[in-house]
Amino acid sequence: MPAETVRKEVALEYCRRVNAGELEGVLQLFAPDALLVDPLGTEPVVGRAALAARLAPALRGAVHEEPGRPYAAHDGTSVVLPATVTVGAPGAPPQRRGRTRVMGVIEVGEDGLIREMRVMWGVTDSSWTARPAPDEERRKELAREHCLRINDGDVDGLLKLYSPRIRFEDPVGSWTRTGLEALRAHATMAVGSNVRETAGLTVAGQDGRHAAVTVSATMDYLPSGPLLARHHLMTLPAPADPHRALIGIEYVMVIGVDADGLIDEMRAYWGATDVSLLDPAA
């Protein structure tokens, strides 16, 4: 399984080659039978020939991808990369270029090649298609509201956002838990560690179901730090003063929303390289 740093570098290299207009170079980053879904909710294209046909018009339109920081996972394959994409039709003047905020969920194989890329962006995330889309905004608001209720220590209020059929994985690659009682235990531990979350970029899928948000979180080292280390989810050295130390976690939360408007799926993408010890005096 490729290391977290390798997966992150593959995602960033994709942006570099796209920005250089290197179609063949871009294709060489993908497995021969790779799958691309862009945007999420449309039909996938499979294989390098189909990828070439899909990517060539964007490269002719001088597409430019400004990547954010990449996020890993503990499954040995995943990396998530937020980006701001600008592109125009081939030959169009600069003032007619569109701007889209996206989140790419990428799977990298043992050979270091991209096996799957699913790009999440909604009509509310692009200047090309910007129009009212209450369903997208509702999903994005649910993702942000999760962070607010955690910050308020409102576990009961948090559970009201979720379906009794919730399945969640935090972090991706650990283990999948199901049901509201499992979520209550998970959230109670977070609140007990004084978690504070700041939501960042939020995007929607065009599948009528998903949304994603980048999150910067801090928490007390105790009591959760030793537990994270025990499960090999964190590889930081023990702090000199664990009672004062803080942990920082940068992650992406992807949610799925059911027909009742409740979250029935939650995946948190973060790896060991997304965790840090913070100076409590800073």
Curated annotation (Swiss-Prot):
Active site positions, chain numbering: 38 (proton acceptor), 170 (proton acceptor)
Disruption phenotype: Cells lacking this gene do not produce lasalocid, they only produce iso-lasalocid.
Outcome (variant: residue 38 to A): Loss of both epoxide-opening activities
Residues that coordinate or bind substrate: 14, 65, 146, 177, 197, 251
Species this protein is from: Streptomyces lasalocidi (Streptomyces lasaliensis)
Annotated effect of mutating residue 197 to A: Retains the 5-exo epoxide-opening activity but loses the 6-endo epoxide-opening activity. Loss of both epoxide-opening activities
Lsd19A: region residues: 1-133
Site positions for Raises pKa of active site Asp-170: 186
Protein name, as recorded: Epoxide hydrolase LasB
Known outcome of mutating residue 170 to A: Retains the 5-exo epoxide-opening activity but loses the 6-endo epoxide-opening activity
Listed EC numbers: 5.5.1.-
Region described as Lsd19B: spans on this chain: 134-282
Protein function: Epoxide hydrolase responsible for the double epoxide-opening cyclization of bisepoxyprelasalocid A to form lasalocid A, a polyether antibiotic. In vitro, accepts various substrate analogs differing in the left segment of lasalocid and epoxide stereochemistry to afford products with excellent regioselectivity.
Domain notes: Consists of two highly homologous domains, oriented in a head-to-tail fashion, that catalyze epoxide-opening cascades independently in lasalocid biosynthesis. The N-terminal domain (Lsd19A) recognizes the internal C18-C19 epoxide of the substrate and catalyzes energetically favored 5-exo cyclization, while the C-terminal domain (Lsd19B) recognizes the internal C22-C23 epoxide of the substrate and predominantly catalyzes energetically disfavored 6-endo cyclization.
